[in-house]
UniProtKB/Swiss-Prot annotation:
Gene that specifies this protein: CNB1
Binding site for Ca(2+) 1: 34, 36, 38, 40, 45
Protein name: Calcineurin subunit B
Other comments on record: This protein has four functional calcium-binding sites.
Organism placement in taxonomy: Eukaryota, Fungi, Dikarya, Basidiomycota, Agaricomycotina
Binding site for Ca(2+) 4: 144, 146, 148, 150, 155
Record organism: Cryptococcus neoformans var. neoformans serotype D (strain JEC21 / ATCC MYA-565) (Filobasidiella neoformans)
């Protein structure tokens, strides 16, 4: 491992929920996923991860992991995204990741349209569009405490307060 890579690993160890040995295992997994050896994972490579491939929100996951919007996920972004799913990841970190799933334009709010689009990805054609829109409208109305027509992170946090988000967003077997 060169000095630059060693420095990157030290930084990742400080800023993620992973130990040095866990980061080494993640690096090996990342390199296996990076089929073309480009140093980053594109959408097709990302969808080879079993826990993500079967998720109806797989494309949202890619967008969240891809912090810089380059269309690919480098190792640091990979670690950053997975860190929220670590058993060492706290409630706030998991809530922030979940919020990002819905905040498609990254403006810090979940709009009616964003909530609709994400829920549509989750339910597919199991609900009629009109039924889904009614659920979205009711959710926004009930959770939107300041009446601005959208959900802030704080409002989102209150809305999901009764759920066990820590358990639901922890992947025991990341390696």
């Amino acid at each position: 491992m060169g000095a630059a890579e060693s420095s990157m690993f030290n930084s990742l160890e400080k800023n993620s929920n992973f130990s040095g040995p866990e980061l080494m295992r993640l690096k090996k997994r990342f390199m296996k996923l990076d089929k073309d050896g480009s140093g980053s994972i594109d959408k097709d490579e990302f969808l080879q991860i079993p826990q993500i491939a079967n998720n109806p929100l797989a494309h949202r996951m890619i967008a969240i992991f891809d912090e810089d919007g380059s269309g690919t996920v480098d190792f640091q972004e990979f670690v950053g995204g997975l860190s929220a799913f670590s058993s060492k990841g706290g409630r706030d970190e998991k809530l922030r990741f979940a919020f990002k799933v819905y905040d498609m334009d990254r403006d810090g709010y979940i709009s009616n349209g964003e909530l609709y689009l994400v829920l549509k990805q989750m339910v597919g054609n199991n609900l009629k569009d009109q039924q889904l829109q009614q659920i979205v409208d009711k959710t926004i109305m009930e959770a939107d405490k300041d009446g601005d027509g959208k959900l802030s992170f704080e409002e989102f946090t209150q809305m999901v307060a009764s759920t066990d988000i820590v358990k639901q967003m922890t992947l025991e077997d990341l390696f």
